Amino acid sequence: LLVKVESFNPGGSVKDRLALAIIIDAEKRGTLKPGQTVIEATSGNTGVALAMVCAARGYPFVAVMSETFSIERRKLMRAYGAKVILTPAAERGSGMVRRAQELAEKHGWFLARQFENPANPAYHRSTTAAEILQDFAGRQLDYFVSGWGTGGTLTGVGEMLKLARPDVKIVTTEPAGAALLAGKEWQPHKIQGWTPDFIPAVLNRTIADENIPVDDITARDTARRLASEEGVFVGISAGATLAAALIAAENAPEGSVILAMLPDTGERYLSTFLFEGVNEGSDDEWLAAQ
C-alpha cells in the first residue's frame, strides 16, 4: 500500500494544482484581467490554494466558505491577503456556491468555478496522472484510491490511468452519511473538503470501478493512526481515503499494489474533531507512571 502525499505542494494540499490551472487557463483565455478580483466558493483547501496563487500573480482574492469549516483555513487564506465571507451552515455547499455567484455578478469579479471548470481535471491529467505513471513505469499498480470533492483528481487521474493502464482498478470513497454516488441522500459530515450537497459537473460519475464509503470516526481514527504509526500527518479526508484503501486491500488478490491519494496535511484541522480528546496540557500523569 503506497500513498501520494499532496501536502508537499507549496500551499499544503492537492488543491494547489487546480488553483494554478484555473488562473493560468483564465489568463490565457483573457477571461481574467490584470488586477481583477478572483472569487470562489470553497471548503478551504481550494481557497488557501487560490489565495496563494492570486497573491503571487497579483490578484485580490475573496473566498466564500461555509461557517462549518475549520478556523485554520480562514487564517491561512487571510495570511495570503484574502478576504473570507462566511455563509450559514444550513445553506450547505450549494449555498456558498450561490453566494459566490451573486457576488461575482454584482462586483464584476472573476468566478473560478472549481466544480465545473474543465481546467480542473485537465491539470490532473497532465500533472498528477503523469507523475503517477512516471513513478510506476515498469512497476506493478493494481488499484488507485481517491475520494472526491470537486471530482477533479478522481476524474483526471482516473481517466488517464484507464487509458494508460486499463487493468488498474479505480476505487473512490465518500462519506458514509453523504454517499451521493451510491445514491444516498446528503447528510452533514465531518470529512471536510469531501462531497458537497451536489455532484459537481467536472466529476466523471462512471470512472470508478468501486465505491467504498467511510464514516467520520473511521476517517479520523485512521488519520490518527497514520501519524502515530507511520509518521505521516494528514487531514481527515486523507484518513478516509487510507481507510478505504485498507478495505480494498483486504479484498484484493495477494500481492496487489494499491496507491492512495492523501489530499492535505493535518495541520489545518487542529481545531476540529481530528484532535478531539487530545491532551493540550502537560503529560504529567504519563510521566509519573514511568
Q: Residue spans of the language-model regions?
A:
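PLP-dependent amino-acid enzyme catalytic core
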Residues: L1-Q290
